[in-house]
Every structure is written in structure tokens, then in C-alpha cells.
Swiss-Prot record:
Gene3D superfamilies: CRAL-TRIO lipid binding domain, N-terminal domain of phosphatidylinositol transfer protein sec14p
Naturally occurring in which organism (per UniProt): Kluyveromyces lactis (strain ATCC 8585 / CBS 2359 / DSM 70799 / NBRC 1267 / NRRL Y-1140 / WM37) (Yeast)
Domain annotation CRAL-TRIO: ranges: 97-270
Name recorded for this polypeptide: SEC14 cytosolic factor
Disulfide bonds: none
Biased composition (Polar residues): 16-28
């Protein structure tokens, strides 16, 4: 079995110069000292895994480099990982119903943006919870969410980092609200709330860019009202767009990487799994796959 250290050594561990403050390669002396202190603290508590710079700095950034708050967050995450069975999720969980679920709630990764990030697309406006819950459960959907997060961390990011030539830590997300109604939004609220909790608490600082497209009338106004109460760094990553979103997406995502349905040129044949199931990106390209191996799939076509 390949060790965590071998995998870390196989791809870049430093973000580009000028990246967000507090990321690997973009630390001031105080942040450097906090990182060292944080690692020593966790080692003294018996932790041996997930102590690399990138991981520890994400927890520190999420808690504004407050050592005690970062420690609590890290400990809660490790406790949750053990209880949820995260370390063996690839062996234990198989989402064979995914091809059917994708028809009622499309969620998928597709290629990369201009900064080398994996592009994650979720078509929330297409959700049909009534049909979906005939073939799966919210519990299994959340298991799949964690499965995808782990694939993102263990396979997608290393491959994207090798291709980019620097450390890629985040995703570029497109959330499509086309066709969403109050009733469908209310239906999926419970899942979205739980999914958000998992992302914020256990996979912090993974959002690079977030595009909310086909936003209903008034959504942008509401967001502007809440902006003063949100973290400025978070706000800088979020873009609320209506139906004329194509130019904005193409500024961040190359046309050849953006699906045709969103204004790009990328098309995928059904033989390859179609847009929803093909999972195309550097993590499927042999030259960028390292000792971790190719990203697994939770289902068989």
C-alpha cells in the first residue's frame, strides 16, 4: 500500500506566488510560526496522519489562525472520520444507483478551469426528489458526497496539481438553478443543509470559485444585503449570475473544458458515460496519475 508521504511527494506542495494569504508558499512569519505550533500540538495529542502543510493550513485559515479553535475543528473532523468510516469508504461503499440518481439530481466533475481546479457542476434546478427517493436515500446520497470529497482530495487534486505544476487545493463550482421552484428547493433543503455542514466542518477551505447561475429574480439583491455580514474572502469567491452567465464562465473556464449546455464547446458521447457520468479530467489521464492510482468509480456503467 502506498503511504500518505509517498503520494504527497509525488505532486507539487506549494501554491502559486500571489495566492490567498495563508496558503502553502504564501505565509508570513507569524503564520509560519502558527503552522509549526499547530503541528507540534497535534503530534503531542497522538495524531499521525493528515499533518501536511496544506491540510493544517486549511484548518488554520478556517479559524483565522486561532490555534485553539483550529485544534477543536481538527479533532472534531478526525472523530467524525472515524465514526463515518471515511478511511475505508472506497472499499465499503458502492453507489450502483448513481446512473439513475444522476437523471434526477445531476452532480458531476468535468475537466478544469484556467487555474487548474477541477470543475464541479450541480444542477439543483433539475432535482426531482420524489423520483430520486424511489431509488436511493438521503443517507446514501450523503455517503456518496463524502465518497466524492475523498476522491477529490486523494485523486483529483494530486492529478490537477501535476498538470498545473503547482498545488491545486480547491474546486471551481457551478450551481445551476435553472427551473428551480420553491417546492423543489424546499424538498432538497434537508440534503443541502447536511451536505453544507459536511463541507464546512470536515473539508474546510475547498471552495476556489463558486458560480450560481440562472439565479431567480431578486437573488442578487438578497445576496448584496447579506454581503456585509459575510467573510470578505468568501464573498470574493462567489458570483451570482442570471441567465446571461456564459461570458463570466468563459473568463474562468476554457471553452474546450466548459460543457456545451453552459456556453462552452465540450461534448461527451453516451458511450463515454455522457456528461453526468464520464468524470473527465486530469485524474483520468495517465500522464498525471501518480502512485495513488486512477480515481475509482462508485458504480459500473
Amino acid at each position: 500500500m502506498v503511504s500518505e508521504q509517498e503520494i504527497l511527494e509525488s505532486y507539487p506542495q506549494v501554491c502559486p506566488s500571489g495566492s490567498l494569504s495563508g496558503t502553502p508558499g504564501n505565509l508570513d512569519s507569524e503564520q509560519e510560526a502558527k503552522l509549526k505550533e499547530f503541528r507540534e500540538l497535534l503530534e503531542s495529542l497522538g495524531y499521525k496522519e493528515r499533518l501536511d502543510d496544506s491540510t493544517l493550513l486549511r484548518f488554520l485559515r478556517a479559524r483565522k489562525f486561532d490555534l485553539e479553535a483550529s485544534k477543536i475543528m481538527y479533532e472534531n473532523c478526525e472523530k467524525w472520520r472515524k465514526e463515518f468510516g471515511v478511511d475505508t469508504i472506497f472499499e465499503d461503499f458502492h453507489y450502483e444507483e448513481k446512473p439513475l440518481v444522476a437523471k434526477y439530481y445531476p452532480q458531476y466533475y468535468h475537466k478544469t478551469d484556467n487555474d487548474g481546479r477541477p470543475v464541479y457542476i450541480e444542477e439543483l434546478g433539475s432535482v426531482n426528489l420524489t423520483q430520486m427517493y424511489k431509488i436511493t436515500t438521503q443517507e446514501r446520497m450523503l455517503k456518496n458526497l463524502v465518497w466524492e470529497y475523498e476522491a477529490f482530495v486523494r485523486y483529483r487534486l494530486p492529478a490537477c496539481s501535476r498538470k498545473a505544476g503547482y498545488l491545486v487545493e480547491t474546486s471551481c463550482t457551478i450551481l445551476d438553478l435553472k427551473g428551480i421552484s420553491i417546492s423543489s428547493a424546499a424538498q432538497v433543503l434537508s440534503y443541502v443543509r447536511e451536505a453544507s455542514n459536511i463541507g464546512q466542518n470536515y473539508y474546510p477551505e475547498r471552495m476556489g470559485k463558486f458560480y450560481l447561475i440562472n439565479a431567480p429574480f431578486g437573488f442578487s439583491t438578497a445576496f448584496r444585503l447579506f454581503k456585509p455580514f459575510l467573510d470578505p474572502v468568501t464573498v470574493s469567491k462567489i458570483f451570482i449570475l442570471g441567465s446571461s452567465y456564459q461570458k463570466d464562465l468563459l473568463k474562468q473556464i476554457p471553452a474546450e473544458n466548459l460543457p456545451k449546455k453552459f456556453g462552452g464547446q465540450s461534448e461527451v458521447s453516451e458511450a463515454e458515460g455522457g456528461l453526468y457520468l464520464s468524470d473527465i479530467g486530469p485524474w483520468r489521464e495517465e500522464e498525471y496519475i501518480g502512485p495513488e492510482g486512477e480515481a475509482p468509480k462508485a458504480f459500473q456503467l
